[in-house]
Curated annotation (Swiss-Prot):
GO biological process: carbohydrate metabolic process; peptidoglycan biosynthetic process; UDP-N-acetylglucosamine biosynthetic process
Family as reported in the entry's similarity comment: Belongs to the phosphohexose mutase family.
Residues that bear Phosphoserine: 99
PANTHER family from the UniProt entry: PHOSPHOGLUCOMUTASE (ALPHA-D-GLUCOSE-1,6-BISPHOSPHATE-DEPENDENT), PHOSPHOHEXOSE MUTASE
Any one of the GO CC terms: cytosol
EC number: 5.4.2.10
Record's protein name: Phosphoglucosamine mutase
GO molecular-function term, one example from the UniProt record: phosphoglucosamine mutase activity
Keywords associated with the record: Isomerase, Magnesium, Metal-binding, Phosphoprotein
General function of this protein: Catalyzes the conversion of glucosamine-6-phosphate to glucosamine-1-phosphate.
Cofactor(s) listed: Mg(2+)
Length: 445
């Protein structure tokens, strides 16, 4: 049985991800990190889901039972956990979140002592430990060696300082009216504080988490309400975060939702113009063809990798690069953070607007993405795509019509993601119907 997906362990809280799994997974991870232990402390944070309390208590029980001390810091963005794990000299960090998923899902992500997400090899080792009953039993310590847990509520200041340090010292946000949609999630305190302290006029939306409303018709996956509010208030820009604030969606002053690849393109050019861009930009295989064209036009190379911000970071390390991201809004400025950070990306875009003295729409309009259609199709089983009869012929036919394709399974759900890209939207709509019917028969038959 495989536990880890694209981004940690994720599933329906109380069913797949119950307290037993959380406790045993924490023990397995703790056993793995014991060999590298320096401080014997592990940091645990979460987003605002009600199930986070159940999972957090189970994780604390598992870790303390094998002798670890646990530092609990409450609701905090995923990138904050990555930063604070290293900043507070912990052996590892754990984030309890299902990111952009609905409240009834939850997840567990791990970070090493340096704030990096774990490689697939390490995740595999933790899975092996998880299923080793003898090793799990043998790891339990005597009564006097059981670990302690303590809750610290004031670490938010450390993260805020680190975020503000990413913003140019010679700029201020005083001239900007900004609308923030924090998705009733982990950034509901941090995001408004950062923007207010840097001088912006801030209007906040979806900042009243009740444990059940995270991501509900708000945030990065549902930016329509933010777009309407930006127009109504005549704001300069709107920023929408997801439940754990590791992704960003930008809305311009006209209420138009920016394409994620347009955002990547203009931020990459901004870094280059400052002389800060190192090596090539990294995006995923789902990136728009227009991004590559835009970057190449400005003398910037683009490399691609699998979907997931940890793969973007891995590729950046190999290339010696410092900027990359995903169309979905995960944007990595590795000079400032080791994972996608929506707040850092929002501040960098704000700095770009201020330094150019241009509107959000005029900046984002530099990159004109080709039409793409993405369909998430629920499926009964995940067959090997290379062995599906007729798929090669289907892809060849689409290629002959100048349609780019990407078909991939979700790492966390029973879905196949079907992506088509071409210059003719009507052709895409027609062909997507055929593609959906093909996969319905192939995977639900």
């Amino acid at each position: 049985m495989k536990l880890f997906g694209t981004d940690g362990v994720r599933g329906k809280a109380g069913e797949f991800l119950d307290s037993f799994l959380a406790m045993r997974l924490a023990m397995a991870a703790g056993i793995y990190f014991k060999d590298k232990s320096i401080t014997n402390n592990i940091l645990v944070g979460k987003d605002t889901r009600r199930s986070g309390y159940m999972i957090e208590n189970a994780i604390v029980s598992g870790l303390t039972s094998i002798g670890y001390n646990v530092i609990q810091i409450g609701p905090m963005p995923t990138p904050a956990i990555a930063f604070l794990t290293e900043d507070m000299r912990c052996d590892a960090g754990i984030m309890i979140s299902a990111s952009h998923n609905p409240y009834y899902d939850n997840g567990i992500k791990f970070f090493d002592a340096h704030g990096n997400k774990l490689s697939e090899d390490i995740e595999k080792k933790i899975e092996e430990i998880y299923f080793d009953d003898k090793l799990i039993q043998a790891s339990k310590v005597d009564m006097e060696k059981i670990g302690q847990a303590k809750r610290i509520d004031d670490v938010i200041g450390r993260y805020i300082v680190s975020i503000k340090n990413s913003f140019p010292k010679d700029l201020t946000l005083k001239s900007l009216r900004v609308v923030l949609d924090v998705a009733h999630g982990a950034a509901y305190k941090v995001a408004p504080t950062v923007f207010k302290e840097l001088g912006a006029e801030v209007i906040v939306m979806s900042d009243k988490p009740n444990g059940l409303n995270i991501n509900e018709n708000c945030g990065a996956l549902h930016p329509a309400n933010l777009a309407a509010e930006v127009k109504r208030l005549r704001a300069d820009v709107g920023f929408a975060f997801d439940g754990d604030a590791d992704r960003l969606v930008v809305v311009d002053e006209k209420g138009e939702v920016a394409n994620g690849d347009s955002l990547l393109g203009v931020l990459a050019l901004y870094l280059k113009e400052q002389g800060k861009l190192q090596s090539s930009v990294v995006a995923t295989i789902m990136s728009n063809g227009a991004l590559k064209e835009f970057l190449n036009k400005h003398g910037i190379e683009l490399d691609t990798c699998n979907v997931g911000d940890k793969y973007v970071l891995e590729k950046l390390k190999v290339n010696g690069g410092n900027f990359g991201g995903e169309q979905s809004g995960h944007i990595i400025f590795s000079d400032y953070a080791k994972t996608g950070d929506g707040l850092i990306a929002a501040l960098q875009f704000s700095a770009l607007m201020l330094s150019k003295k241009k509107s959000a729409s005029s900046i984002l309009g530099q990159v004109k993405p080709y039409p793409q259609l993405l369909t998430n199709l629920k499926i009964a089983e995940k067959k090997d795509l290379d062995k599906i009869k007729g798929l090669k012929e289907l892809k060849k036919d689409l290629e002959n019509k100048n349609i780019n394709t990407l078909f991939r399974y979700s790492g966390t759900e029973n879905l196949i993601r079907l992506l088509l890209e071409a210059k003719d939207i009507k052709l895409l709509e027609k062909e997507m119907k055929n593609v959906v019917e093909f996969f319905k028969k192939a995977l639900n038959g």
